[in-house]
């Protein structure tokens, strides 16, 4: 790819960032489509995020992806949020239209799309959702919008717990889905929730390098064959949770599905063109 002065810049703002496959995936897609954009990753944490957004405007970047730990903070720095993004309280995509910034969240639509593509119908189902960060709440919000009956969200009593309660209130007030929030330390409640759940989704970074030997499921007997287990983490590809799930006879969806589908939607938001899905799946080794 020969980058010329006519090319526009798209970024990814996160910390840490070096593990991300998004730059490789998006640049392969842009090159295949013959579009004059290049995608670059920037190490940006909460402290440097405000300045980075000013830089985005000054450089007339087309937009940026937003990942941990900036997804919730980013809502404060855009001019407009989609209804779904308001429900989530976090964004992973910013589109810059001549200095007017729009915030979107494709994490939820991407993950739910991956579930649907596997042949699983979420309508009327119950999900146990681990975590209350930007990705997790995006998945919960989109699942609620698309027909989940109940979401049992588990999170430790950390800085995200109050945000989880606020998220649950927003979803309960605006959808037909019932969301409850429980401290993950309550292992009895966790076990009972899994016993009646249809889906278990890990929306935390537990399982991601350097936590690849960790899982929030301490007892594999809590997993049953009727449970669909899904991951947001894709590095490593096969997390400990997915290994546990397969040993227990569960159907699984790895983090590549969410990465692919949320990235496809981002691509279209930035470029106005269709994402070369089958090509990207092939060259990135994402499988069917």
Swiss-Prot record:
Entry EC no(s): 1.1.1.282
UniProt cross-references to SUPFAM superfamilies, sorted A to Z: Aminoacid dehydrogenase-like, N-terminal domain, NAD(P)-binding Rossmann-fold domains
Chain sites annotated for binding NAD(+): 132-135, 155-158, 205, 232-235, 255
Molecular functions (GO terms): quinate 3-dehydrogenase (NAD+) activity; quinate 3-dehydrogenase (NADP+) activity; shikimate 3-dehydrogenase (NAD+) activity; shikimate 3-dehydrogenase (NADP+) activity
Binding-site positions, substrate: 71, 107
Pathway: Metabolic intermediate biosynthesis; chorismate biosynthesis; chorismate from D-erythrose 4-phosphate and phosphoenolpyruvate: step 4/7
Record keyword NADP present: yes
Reaction catalysis annotation: L-quinate + NAD(+) = 3-dehydroquinate + NADH + H(+); L-quinate + NADP(+) = 3-dehydroquinate + NADPH + H(+); shikimate + NADP(+) = 3-dehydroshikimate + NADPH + H(+); shikimate + NAD(+) = 3-dehydroshikimate + NADH + H(+)
Enzyme class: oxidoreductase
Key words of the record: Amino-acid biosynthesis, Aromatic amino acid biosynthesis, NAD, NADP, Oxidoreductase
Keyword Cell inner membrane on entry: no
Pfam families in alphabetical order: SDH_C (PF18317), Shikimate_dh_N (PF08501)
GO BP terms: amino acid biosynthetic process; aromatic amino acid family biosynthetic process; chorismate biosynthetic process; shikimate metabolic process
Known role: The actual biological function of YdiB remains unclear, nor is it known whether 3-dehydroshikimate or quinate represents the natural substrate. Catalyzes the reversible NAD-dependent reduction of both 3-dehydroshikimate (DHSA) and 3-dehydroquinate to yield shikimate (SA) and quinate, respectively. It can use both NAD or NADP for catalysis, however it has higher catalytic efficiency with NAD.
HAMAP family membership: Shikimate_DH_AroE (MF_00222), Shikimate_DH_YdiB (MF_01578)
PANTHER family reported for this sequence: BIFUNCTIONAL 3-DEHYDROQUINATE DEHYDRATASE_SHIKIMATE DEHYDROGENASE, CHLOROPLASTIC, SHIKIMATE DEHYDROGENASE
Family in the record: Belongs to the shikimate dehydrogenase family.
Subunit structure comment from the entry: Homodimer.
Protein name (record): Quinate/shikimate dehydrogenase
Organism the protein comes from: Escherichia coli O157:H7
């Amino acid at each position: 790819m020969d980058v010329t002065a006519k090319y526009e810049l798209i970024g990814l703002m996160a910390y840490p960032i070096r593990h991300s496959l998004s730059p490789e995936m998006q640049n392969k897609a842009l090159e295949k489509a013959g579009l004059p954009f290049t995608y670059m990753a920037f190490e940006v944490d909460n402290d440097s995020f405000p300045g980075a957004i000013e830089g985005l405007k000054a450089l007339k970047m087309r937009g940026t992806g937003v990942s941990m730990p900036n997804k919730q903070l980013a809502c404060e720095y855009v001019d407009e949020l989609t209804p779904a993004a308001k429900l989530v309280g976090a964004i992973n995509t910013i589109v810059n239209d001549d200095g007017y910034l729009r915030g979107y969240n494709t994490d939820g639509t991407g993950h739910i799309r991956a579930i649907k593509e596997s042949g699983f119908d979420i309508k009327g189902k119950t999900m146990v959702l681990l975590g209350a960060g930007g990705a997790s709440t995006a998945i919960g919000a989109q699942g609620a919008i698309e027909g989940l009956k109940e979401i049992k969200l588990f999170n430790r009593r950390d800085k995200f717990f109050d945000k989880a309660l606020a998220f649950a209130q927003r979803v309960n007030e605006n959808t037909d889905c019932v969301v409850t929030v429980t401290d993950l330390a309550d292992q009895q409640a966790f076990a009972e929730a899994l016993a009646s759940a249809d889906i278990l989704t890990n929306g935390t970074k537990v399982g991601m390098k350097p936590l690849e030997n960790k899982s929030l499921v301490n007892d594999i007997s809590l997993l049953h064959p009727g449970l669909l287990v899904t991951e947001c983490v894709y590095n490593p590809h096969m997390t400990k949770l997915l290994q546990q799930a397969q040993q227990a006879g569960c159907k699984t969806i790895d983090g590549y599905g969410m990465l692919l589908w949320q990235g496809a939607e981002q691509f279209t938001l930035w470029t106005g063109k269709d994402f070369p899905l089958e090509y990207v799946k092939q060259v990135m080794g994402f499988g069917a």
